[in-house]
Amino acid sequence: QALLEYFISKAHENSIVLFPHSRVVIGIPSGATEVEKRAVYDAAMAAGARETYMILEPAAAAIGAGLPIESDMGNMIVDVGGGTTEVAIISAGGIVISRSLRVAGDELDQDIIEYIRSKYNLFIGEQMAEKVKIAIGSAYPLNEEKTVDVRGRNLITGLPEAIEISSIEIREALSPSIQVIIDTIKDALDESPPEILADLMDNGICLTGGTAQLQGLVERLSNEVRVRVWVAEDPMTCVARGCGMVLDDLDLYENLLVGIERDPYTNTQG
């Protein structure tokens, strides 16, 4: 809620209206429960929003990536963020199939932490793990493998220690979680109607989210699912851009807005 209050207040700073009328569009995971949806809605209202709308993150990502979601042709979006990976197939302005899993960038950081702890008896923090992931993390063999120095605390001696670790090792650490994402994509493809599957073979799979930039992820996915995979422009901001586009034209995207059950408020969702 504090974060929402900050952004809403920032939006008000340049307002010339004495009592600004804030409208907010928030992206939520497709696996969010009714309780979680209500919590997000209530937090936004308590933070100062006057109208709060919610949209599933994969739909927002697809809009922000510029996919023709209103077309009858099927499009697939895979949004690999920090906390969740959202897999969705969209056609004719609606979500045909969606999957949400809590395996994404944060989980990859934990994979690195656990791998280094197990193999080297070295404890590193989340920031160091993320730096390693960005520097040498990969999902597919690199043309030139890399190494990086990692600093942490030796779990046996309790003393600071530095080791050199390779991109091959980090790829090994990340591989199980990457495979979970791949299997989820395969499951969604297996459930797709034949006509939509044909569209996906033509259109490919669009990757968004910060983790979409992981080295070799496109190659690994393409090889495993046998469908062309491509990364959207500025993938990290696709969900935010999509939410902004929805806010600018709520009528156009009305069918993609997410309602909440038993809404006591009269001015928005319900």
Predicted feature descriptions by range:
Residues 1-80, 88-205, 212-270:
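Nucleotide/phosphate-binding catalytic cleft detector across ATP-hydrolyzing
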